[in-house]
């Protein structure tokens, strides 16, 4: 199982979103996603998060929260465990991203963007105001979402 991170960076009621329009043969082509990527050898999720955000945006995170785990199962690729974060503190200025166009989008409008169907599921969990950690499994067949597990919530002390 591969490990990835995804972060929704917040500022003034908006999330920083990445419109994937620059890479060829990109499974995310044309979609809007948060910032993140694959963990490198021996990286913790937090190390991966900070590195990926810096590489893709130029920003250095100063305040972030681990919000949930998403297990992706697909008949076309290796299973993925995605660590979902939100961040509300950062330093630096946005840079040009070689994977797509970065844009600040009103949080309420994000689920209406062209995203993966499963992304809308966990985006709605984040936007619900519920603060507890979540875990959910999303199963895809090709590009179609065929199963969504009931999200579990955990209080972390």
Locate each region found by the language model.
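Conserved N-terminal beta-strand and adjoining loop/helix that marks the start
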Residues: 1-17, 38
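Conserved hydrophobic/aromatic beta-strand scaffold that supports enzyme active sites
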Residues: 6-8, 17, 82-86, 104
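Conserved Nudix-box catalytic region and its N-terminal flanking loop in Nudix hydrolases
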Residues: 16-51, 149
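A short coil-to-beta-strand element that immediately follows conserved catalytic motifs
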Residues: 60-68
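NUDIX/MutT-family hydrolases
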Residues: 86, 95-125, 149
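Short, active-site-adjacent segments that bind or coordinate small-molecule cofactors and metal centers
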Residues: 126-145
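Residue-level detector of conserved catalytic or cofactor/ligand-binding positions
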Residues: 146-157
